[in-house]
């Protein structure tokens, strides 16, 4: 029997998988993008906030946008600080529509998208890679052949690690998010504001958030980082902190829950993931492109997908025989900032007793320009924190004078 043949099979239609398939399909390659969920509305698991530059960089349409925001707020147990801009600072993507758009681009450029197909296994035969899927609607097993196989299965890492026992220890995190419909007056108050909550009052050993979506809808979520077994003990369920935000912060009296979803993060400390093996290449969360400090992954997964796409093209053209240069370039791009983020995550989520570090950080940031705060939070330019020390030191000196100057 002759199997259907592709240049590239990509398993997982998240941001990295969808964007990689989109790039390769546009270049004329025959791509199969396979996703185990039968609709993009299932497990709509990303909070999906991103800076405004993401739209132009990745050519994303208005239809993928849930809302724009021009204000950024950080709430701690004791402190509230906001930064604003007269123009939009970023968007919250409609994650389902965003992924559906990427898939439509794949199909529009002559390639295929299969929804409701679960990856089972792969094998080598006659110089080709045979990939086996199970069609979830009827249980039918389908095989295809490919020249390159891409693992975009996220934290599952289903292709790179055949058995669960083969996986190394990962740092892990988990988050849940409610999409709620609120009264117009509540929505209007927070419609343009990206709000993060830090500190033991709002979310011990993690953070929570309120993001605007379409009219009268807000995303309310909470995430927790497990850096060591001590973290897990004596912690309340995440949903407790979501209801805390709804009841105490939003004070919505007649909200309606539209959707609940959640996800897990498995992050390789030191970026020691398997990036490639023979003609198999891994992208997105499969190689920890999500930033561990804040859990943001969409932009970084798409960045990595573009790097992978470049090397896949070279491989198919016979210019390279393996993907080692891909691994090298990924480390060059991510290592430094990700390592700093790891260390900050440990300090914030494990070592920050009574929110001392959190409050001190906000004390630094409050004197900074909005664009500098955006650079720190979204571009990880941590060196800019020093720019806030001027105002911080001035305030400390003034306090000293008041205390001892009579």
Which ranges hold each PLM region?
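N-terminal FAD cofactor-binding segment of flavoenzymes
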Residues: 36-74
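FAD/FMN-dependent oxidoreductases across multiple families
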Residues: 226-311, 316, 320, 324
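Glycine-rich FAD pyrophosphate-binding loop
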Residues: 9, 13, 23-44
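Beta1/beta-strand and adjacent pyrophosphate-binding region of the FAD-binding site
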Residues: 2-16
